[in-house]
A protein has these predicted regions:
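Ubiquitin system architectures
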Residues: 1-88
Length: 88
């Protein structure tokens, strides 16, 4: 099933959809296609908790019942700047 996500970083907001069975790493690849930053320079968060690249979106709590087109799941995005990641 599809999940719908709002990915936010500062003033940038991306609306994306993915399969509930997609991994967090696969979501990072989608973001890479849009923002041109590789997955290793990205960190994704849900409710201020860092998401594990190997987990599926469903395992992270983004289910088709929760992340709807009219009420998408919110994902925080941080980029690596120099040696550290920026705050969300």
């Amino acid at each position: 099933m599809d999940v719908f996500l709002l990915i936010r970083r500062g003033k940038t907001t991306i609306f994306a959809d993915a399969k509930e069975s997609s991994t967090v790493f696969e979501l990072k690849r989608i973001i890479q296609g849009i923002l041109k930053r590789p997955p290793d320079e990205q960190q994704l968060y849900k409710d201020d908790h860092l998401l594990d690249d190997s987990k599926t979106l469903g395992e992270c709590g983004f289910t088709s019942q929760m992340a709807l087109p009219q009420a998408p799941g919110i994902v925080g995005l941080a980029f690596r700047e120099d040696e550290a990641f920026e705050d969300v």
